[in-house]
């Protein structure tokens, strides 16, 4: 079997911390170990930089960089050339908004029956309003584009042979909004969490743990960073370590949203916060190891958090709010409804060794369900069903 995967890259400047890249090199290794040919289409700027993926399985083309380019730019001629050369059995599309482009290309080449499209939606352009209703994500609505992006995702559900999202919460978001606008989904949205990154287990753990609280998420306003800043301000007796994966963010991306820079500057003003560059993977892992607990993002529409899973892999318990996909990721006794309960959980984890150990154990239980081999087996099961 031949699989041709189209990479989604949201962070070309810091590729080591890009979730789409991590997802693809993780499943690529598993597919190749099973004797399945797995090639990846990647942005040409990354030529020579992707040492986690065999060079014989990389194809470099011109792709988008910004959040809109990646959703609208499609190198038709270059992708067509690869498909005609390879005749893949599966086109694994990690930028689901481009599904209709791929389908049209397959129709034109006469390969629409031979090549199946598997679309993986890494990020639905939806959010939760203050009233608790599903709404468009304002961070993807510059110029009113969010509705079109969502429409392309719904088109992908109906066109792709398989359409995956990361969590039941992500599926619920898409289905709820489709019902709200009267859009008929003709096919099933399937749930498939991203696998954990094997490198998190392979790295040695030499760091000495301190009573420090880790926050290892992007600093967008939409991630709830301002709520985190308020929590830090109200708890000056606690020490926080923030790993920012976007310190090298390019100006072409920053002009759409300056909140990561604004929030980073606000955190730098606080005496109980230290900020590290989270884009280097080994430095990032050492930062996780040095902390006692971690806090999930405060994002009300969080469809998954690979950063939370990173902590689980390194034996670090994570607390988080009792909403969104955290109900599927974080043990119930580590979720909170109020800021006061959040503080109580922090104190308990810092002061009670037995509770901390029980929390580590419970967090690690999830990992059995999302190992790379388990996730690839689940993908193969669904692929076999449509072939």
Where are these regions (language model features)?
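Short hydrophobic beta-strand element within catalytic cores of glycosyltransferases
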Residues: 313, 317-320
């Amino acid at each position: 079997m031949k699989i041709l995967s189209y990479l989604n890259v949201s962070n070309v400047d810091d590729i080591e911390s890009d979730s789409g890249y991590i997802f693809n090199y993780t499943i690529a290794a598993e597919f190749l170990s099973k004797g399945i040919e797995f090639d990846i289409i990647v942005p040409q700027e990354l030529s020579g930089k992707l040492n986690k993926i065999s060079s014989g399985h990389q194809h470099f083309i011109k792709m988008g960089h910004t959040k809109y380019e990646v959703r609208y730019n499609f190198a038709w001629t270059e992708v067509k050339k690869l498909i005609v050369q390879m005749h893949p059995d599966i086109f694994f599309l990690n930028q689901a908004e481009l599904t209709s482009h791929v389908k049209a290309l397959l129709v034109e080449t006469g390969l629409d029956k031979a090549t199946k499209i598997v679309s993986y939606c890494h990020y639905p352009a939806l959010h939760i309003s203050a009233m608790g209703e599903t709404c468009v994500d304002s961070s993807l609505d510059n110029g009113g584009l969010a509705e079109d992006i969502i429409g392309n995702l719904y088109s992908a559900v109906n066109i792709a042979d398989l359409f995956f999202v990361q969590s039941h919460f992500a599926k619920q978001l898409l289905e709820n909004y489709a019902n709200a606008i009267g859009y008929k989904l003709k096919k099933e949205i399937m749930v498939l969490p991203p696998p954990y990154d094997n490198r998190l287990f392979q790295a040695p753990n030499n760091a000495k743990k301190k009573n420090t609280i880790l926050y290892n998420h992007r600093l967008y306003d939409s991630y709830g960073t301002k709520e985190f800043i308020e929590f830090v301000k109200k708890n000056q007796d606690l020490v926080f370590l923030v790993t920012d994966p976007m310190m090298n963010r390019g100006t072409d991306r920053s002009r759409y949203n300056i909140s990561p820079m604004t929030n980073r500057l606000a955190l730098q003003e606080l005496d109980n916060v230290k900020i590290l560059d989270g884009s280097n993977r080994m430095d990032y892992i050492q930062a996780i190891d040095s902390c006692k607990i971690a806090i999930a993002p405060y994002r009300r529409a969080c469809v998954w958090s690979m950063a939370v899973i990173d902590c689980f892999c390194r034996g670090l318990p994570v607390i988080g709010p009792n909403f969104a996909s955290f109900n599927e990721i974080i043990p119930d006794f580590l979720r909170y409804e109020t800021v006061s309960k959040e503080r109580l959980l922090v104190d308990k984890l810092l002061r009670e060794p037995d509770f901390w150990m029980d929390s580590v154990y419970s967090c690690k239980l999830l990992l059995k369900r999302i190992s790379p081999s388990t996730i690839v087996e689940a993908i193969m099961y669904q692929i076999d069903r449509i072939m």
